[in-house]
């Protein structure tokens, strides 16, 4: 399993548009991709679960990938977070 921590920089946090884009990115991989905030872990492939975390600006999340293509998944997701969140 590979993971990274990220502090959300955008004012609106993870709202509908970037959440949808993030789910789309996560679905490209066979690995299970998750996000954790305040001890609650949700799959990145489930939009409503992701939105239920209520991630806001300044929150620190942990993104993890576990599976055969976890290295590629983490690289792609980290780049997505840095570019969009």
Residue ranges and their predicted role:
Residues 1-2, 23-31, 74-75, 84:
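Short charge-dense sequence patches
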Residues 1-5, 60-62:
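Intrinsic-disorder/low-complexity, polar/charged segments enriched in Ser/Thr/Lys/Arg/Asp/Glu/Gln
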Residues 52-85:
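C-terminal structural segments of small proteins and small subunits
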């Amino acid at each position: 399993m590979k993971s990274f921590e990220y502090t959300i920089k955008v004012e609106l946090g993870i709202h509908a548009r970037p959440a949808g884009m993030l789910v789309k990115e996560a679905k490209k991989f066979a690995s299970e991709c998750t996000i954790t905030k305040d001890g609650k872990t949700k799959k990145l492939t489930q939009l409503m679960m992701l939105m239920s975390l209520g991630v806001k600006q300044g929150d620190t999340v942990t993104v993890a990938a576990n599976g055969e293509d976890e290295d590629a998944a983490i690289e792609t997701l980290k780049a997505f977070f840095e570019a969009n969140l």
